[in-house]
Amino acid sequence: VNCSVDCQLQVFNWSCPSTPSTPPPSTPTTPTSSQTTTPSTPSTTSSKSTPSTPQSTSSKSTPSTPPKTTLPGCLDFDPPRQVNETWWLCNCTMAICKYDNVVEIVELECNPPPMPTCSNGLKPVRVPDPDGCCWHWECDCYCTGWGDPHFVTFDGLYYSYQGNCTYVLVEEITPTVDNFGVYIDNYHCDANDKVSCPRTLIVHHETQEVLIKTVHMMPIEVEVQVNKQLVALPYKKYGLEVYQSGINFVVDIPRLGAQVSYNGLSFSIRLPYHLFGNNTKGQCGTCTNNTADDCILPSGEIISNCEVAADEWLVNDPSKPHCPHKGLTTKRPAITTPGPFPENCTVSPVCQLIMDSLFSQCHPFVPPKHYYEACLFDSCFVAGSGMECASVQAYAALCAQEGVCIDWRNHTQGACAVTCPAHRQYQACGPSEEPTCQSSSPKNSTLLVEGCFCPEGTTKFAPGYDVCVKICGCVGPDNVPREFGEHFEFDCKDCVCLEGGSGIVCQPKKCARGNLTTCEEDGTYLVVEADPDDKCCNTTSCKCDPKRCKAERPSCLLGFEVKSEHVPGKCCPVYSCVPKGVCVHENAEYQPGSPVYSNKCQDCVCTDSMDNSTQLNVISCTHVPCNISCSSGFELVEVPGECCKKCQQTHCIIKRPEQQYIILKPGEIQKNPNDRCTFFSCMKINNQLISSVSNITCPDFDPSDCVPGSITYMPNGCCKTCIHNPNNTVPCSAIPVMKEISYNGCAKNISMNFCAGSCGTFAMYSAQAQDLDHGCSCCREERTSVRMVSLDCPDGSKLSHSYTHIESCLCQGTVCELPQAQQSRTRRSSPRLLGRK
């Protein structure tokens, strides 16, 4: 076999001599070639090829060539091939290099492999072999969750889990895809915080993070974010697509064959086995077509309880500080399980629909047990929330994938109704990709989903346009459907809907040409504005702008003001000076009733009367009235430059209780007749009369210490004095007394001591010293101590404070000193004393 110039195989046949030194020639029979694909797990079965007849043998015969130890390969091929090397040609044809450019052609024929049983209860799917010739069965990795929430793993294991954190649904054990993972954000959705519901489905793929969030539950409202930004659907970027399919929001990664959907109540994840088999971890299990290893921990350990394992698949979520983070060594808080069904639980009749004849056609394809049990659970523990509808909805969705369409919502008495927009109708089994005018036959038209679809007889215009049209014409930026050939106006353009091309063609609207206008009147200008009868066209007119008027406002005299008058039909005002109705005096204006200063001896006022000659108001004046009498202590005196005499104070006036007054001349002192210790005085300082009331403070006086009959008044007539009785002397001692201590606004009354009493103090003449001899001692503290007291503050608090407490008193000697005046008198009297001697 050789390759021709036009890349065609040329087959040559001839007989080769039989000699021991040459290899045996190929016979024109087709060698048997078969290929068997052995599945690595029970989830795949492969087709097998059957032998076919070889098409050629080749080529040269060299009987004279001596025997060779190594057979030459097919060196004439590009690239050169070695002996027994195989390569694919086309149409499932394989070439085998036999020796020395001899090539064997083998055609593969595939036998259908036996259909395996998938542990998740779904039908296996046909998957092409890597060679593209044969195919094999695989059980797709399909995980779903719904309600509060209930899970069915990739391998079909059912369990419920009530965590309210963010968890890993699926990640790769050994990463083969950059940053791939699916995560679920749960929250407590009942009043007792015992059950949880899904809130956000999160999909990671390479550089993108997709969040499908439930923003409102009844009715369900969902939004989609990509990398924390809201996006419109359909969205397609970097190998990832997000679109709405019925009531579901789908994240599709075509390169991986991965699909993730979420509708606010349930989610599903479908992954191809040949890419993700034996390589998944998380709450969705391991995808091995074996439920025994689904309850796997992040450490790789397999346990028997999936609820316990699910609690370990936490995702660090800063928005949920109550959730433990990865790497914590402390014991995780136990998940609160709802416990057994309450005795008073009334099961919703919606759940019985799953087991009734309504779904009987689906029972052979999808076992209903798990969905029925989940529905009972939700109707008891989240009663009245409509959560039981999620179980029926999830089961009906799987039935639709198996081709069994069930319109079940009409049998729930409105408990699970779906509300559609006015321009759409609910269908239990519509196309997963709704047909549009641009694509009438979507690639997944055989898949069925429930949702809100365009009514019969209408078609969705295009992806991203929520517009249903009867005739596939055009939809412009106003979202109004148009028929082909229809003319319409939009954005001041004349548009037409055309078949083909961009669809809508628009041209600027043509307006009638108006007459040019010139504006000659003062203050007017030309303006172009929208025509009130046709907003797309303009009209020209003259408008008035007072700021453009050239006539200046006149300057008016005092007492007059400018008046502007608008004449009908004129743009600019007419100005004139009119009286303001005021008085004018010395270049100042006065309002009627206001005083007008003329001179000191007149009181003038502006009147309402107008002088017809000047058109100004008249000023009326009267002489200023003068005082003719003054109150006590004051006298009328002449004031230079004033019209009237002024009352000037000449005496001090002291007001006493009971409306009594004492009048004193400057320098006069008067005692209070009712109180010997109080006297009044009047002084003149810097021409100001200052009165004062003085009180004499007397020293302590105890009549019991006096010689009887010796009590007299001091010269001031206020204080008493007497001859001291020496027999009543009290010795120096510590005397207790109640006294208030205050500090920083806080105070308290406490008992403290003070020193008082008589000590041996004397003064006598000394003949030896020829002077007075003094002996002085004071009653002073002998021992003291520092004590603490708790003061009461106005705000109710306490303040600790220290003070000195006198423990005992003692007479202590001191130097006797006389006042300065007495010392002077003593010095003056000394000579007389010396003289007497």
From Swiss-Prot:
Pfam families: C8, Cys_knot, VWD. It comes from Rattus norvegicus (Rat). Multimeric. Glycans are attached at residues 91, 164, 278, 289, 344, 410, 444, 515, 538, 612, 627, 695, 727, 749. Residues 29-70 have a biased composition (Low complexity). Keywords: Disulfide bond, Glycoprotein, Repeat, Secreted. The lineage of its organism: Eukaryota, Metazoa, Chordata, Craniata, Vertebrata. Sequence repeats lie at residues 17-27, 28-38, 39-50, 51-62, 63-70. Coats the epithelia of the intestines. Residues 732-817 form the CTCK domain. Residues 141-324 form the VWFD domain. Residues 17-70 are annotated as: 5 X 11 AA approximate tandem repeats. It is found in: Secreted. InterPro entries: Cys_knot_C, Cystine-knot_cytokine, Glyco_hormone_CN, Mucin_vWF_Thrombospondin_sf, Ser_inhib-like_sf, VWF/SSPO/ZAN-like_Cys-rich_dom, VWF_dom, VWF_type-D. It comes from the Eukaryota. Transmembrane segments: none annotated. Residues 472-543, 581-648 form the VWFC domain. Disulfide bonds join 143-284, 165-323, 189-197, 732-779, 746-793, 755-809, 759-811. Residues 149-837 are annotated as: Probably important for disulfide-bond mediated mucin polymerization (link domain). This is Intestinal mucin-like protein. One of its GO terms (cellular component) is extracellular region. Coiled coil: none annotated. Residues 17-75 are annotated as: Disordered. SMART domains: C8, CT, VWC, VWD.
